[in-house]
Amino acid sequence: MSRIPFIYCILSAFLSAACSFRAPEEHDDASVDIIPGLEIPEFADNEDIVAHLGYTASYNHRTLVPDWVAWELTAEEANGQLNDQYPFSRDPSVNFPKASREDYSNTGWDKGHMAPRADMKWSSQALEESYYFTNVCPQDHEMNSQAWEQIERLSRLAARHYGSVYIVCGPVFTEGRYGTIGRAQVHVPDMFYKALLTHTGKGYQTVGFIMKNQPECSQPVNYAVSVDSIEALIGRNLFPQLPDEQAEATYEMKYWTK
């Protein structure tokens, strides 16, 4: 899968500039080199990459959902206190075709955040942009409000504990069993994945999760897999800049259940 050197450099520059808005974390390990855009997965030259203040996404104009959404969550951001409510809306920075609120109306599917609003409560702009449909997929309500949300909480706890966590998640299409919704024909995913990366002070640690788009209410450990397993499923390198490839091959839940 080819990369876009020029776009990737611009994206890294954007992310580096965005970091200037974030205060240094007391958890930071001075021995760890900061790698701008470490959360950004490998992407192809035909992907529509959108960089917002709190997350970066690849929007798919065929499925009308993001292929992936990636963000770094710091300890300070995980403690954000803003609680403004915004309507879901079309992302003005992407071209048509794109999903709208009407496509989800009366379908029985949640407008499921990929980068959760609770991770964006450190900035009004980041919070508002989390409601763009470039960050939304149709999700089963029980899964979205229970098992998926538990993994979101786990991510915030890890960010507070280690200082920051790099996160990438997105939909998985296998059988297409749920078809499409709305006039625009938004594709409903069969599953979702989420991959987490952090530095513990002693080395990089990762964990992945794969969850079916159906009622799910179990504990995160029951959905845990290696990042390599997710990459094999979706055919994408999730952390191409990670210096330690071995960290993707295994996972230990003890690093994620503090």
Regions found by a protein language model. Name each.
Residues 8-16:
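Bacterial N-terminal signal peptides
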Residues 1-7:
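Bacterial N-terminal signal peptides that target proteins for export
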Residues 17-258:
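Domain-level detector for secreted/extracellular nuclease and nuclease-toxin modules, and
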